[in-house]
Amino acid sequence: MKRVSVKNYLVCLLIAVCAIFVFPANASAMHIMEGYLAPGWCISWGVMCMPFLVIGFFSIKKKIEVSSKNLTLLAMCGAFAFVLSALKMPSVTGSCSHPTGVGLGAVLFGPTAMSVIGAIILLFQAILLAHGGITTLGANVFSMAIVGPLVSFGVFKLSKRWGAKAGLAVFLAVFFGDLMTYVITSVELAMAYPDATGSFMVSLGKFISIFGFTQVPLAVCEGLLTVVIYNVLAKYSAKELKALSAIY
């Protein structure tokens, strides 16, 4: 059987990215959209993101200095996340449901590195695809590029410690990271738009319940897809993954 290199998968992902630009999704399908949050919330979420982005920058720099091949893997993780997070399914007003794609990168490179990649992805989507917005970038980064990868990384490490097989550990990491992204998105929306009675919890329950109908199936599908890609990388880039402590 002909050996398939990691570069071929990267090329396929880049082609998919180009296809998104050629056949863009409807602009009504997006992350928390431009102008949907009050300025105070936009500033607050943005400030909360800054420490993670700074730490993530140095984390990426260190990993690339260790091996230049990590740059190819990181680019692939970024392309994978870009493609998946651009696949929109309409959900509650002002937002949407979609895979996040950041779980793979979190497992391979850690959560802080993926926070930088996720922020870049969200910025490009806001500017070029009208997905999300500039003012709401901080809120979207916090939920998808910070909390999601943190949860995925934590679940992967715990699963590894408890003796779970690599495939199961990756699936659980991606699944829970995906769901937690939307829990945080629901928190952001509930804080900005509490129930008419003034209850945060009532509003949060409404947002989470609506997101759940679309996000749970998407999280399962993303988990299965990520396991397939992880297995391919583990087969053809085992040395690099071992160096990243992402294989066992």
UniProtKB/Swiss-Prot annotation:
<keyword id="KW-0732">Signal</keyword>
<comment type="function">
    <text>Part of the energy-coupling factor (ECF) transporter complex CbiMNOQ involved in cobalt import.</text>
</comment>
<dbReference type="GO" id="GO:0015087">
    <property type="term" value="F:cobalt ion transmembrane transporter activity"/>
</dbReference>
<keyword id="KW-0472">Membrane</keyword>
<comment type="subunit">
    <text>Forms an energy-coupling factor (ECF) transporter complex composed of an ATP-binding protein (A component, CbiO), a transmembrane protein (T component, CbiQ) and 2 possible substrate-capture proteins (S components, CbiM and CbiN) of unknown stoichimetry.</text>
</comment>
<keyword id="KW-0406">Ion transport</keyword>
<keyword id="KW-0813">Transport</keyword>
<feature type="signal peptide">
    <location>
        <begin position="1"/>
        <end position="29"/>
    </location>
</feature>
<feature type="transmembrane region" description="Helical">
    <location>
        <begin position="210"/>
        <end position="230"/>
    </location>
</feature>
<dbReference type="InterPro" id="IPR018024">
    <property type="entry name" value="CbiM"/>
</dbReference>
<keyword id="KW-0812">Transmembrane</keyword>
<comment type="similarity">
    <text>Belongs to the CbiM family.</text>
</comment>
<keyword id="KW-0171">Cobalt transport</keyword>
<dbReference type="Pfam" id="PF01891">
    <property type="entry name" value="CbiM"/>
</dbReference>
<comment type="pathway">
    <text>Cofactor biosynthesis; adenosylcobalamin biosynthesis.</text>
</comment>
<feature type="transmembrane region" description="Helical">
    <location>
        <begin position="136"/>
        <end position="156"/>
    </location>
</feature>
<dbReference type="GO" id="GO:0009236">
    <property type="term" value="P:cobalamin biosynthetic process"/>
</dbReference>
<feature type="transmembrane region" description="Helical">
    <location>
        <begin position="104"/>
        <end position="124"/>
    </location>
</feature>
<dbReference type="InterPro" id="IPR002751">
    <property type="entry name" value="CbiM/NikMN"/>
</dbReference>
<feature type="transmembrane region" description="Helical">
    <location>
        <begin position="72"/>
        <end position="92"/>
    </location>
</feature>
<dbReference type="GO" id="GO:0043190">
    <property type="term" value="C:ATP-binding cassette (ABC) transporter complex"/>
</dbReference>
<keyword id="KW-0169">Cobalamin biosynthesis</keyword>
<keyword id="KW-1003">Cell membrane</keyword>
<protein>
    <recommendedName>
        <fullName>Cobalt transport protein CbiM</fullName>
    </recommendedName>
</protein>
<feature type="transmembrane region" description="Helical">
    <location>
        <begin position="167"/>
        <end position="187"/>
    </location>
</feature>
<keyword id="KW-1133">Transmembrane helix</keyword>
<keyword id="KW-0170">Cobalt</keyword>
<feature type="transmembrane region" description="Helical">
    <location>
        <begin position="40"/>
        <end position="60"/>
    </location>
</feature>
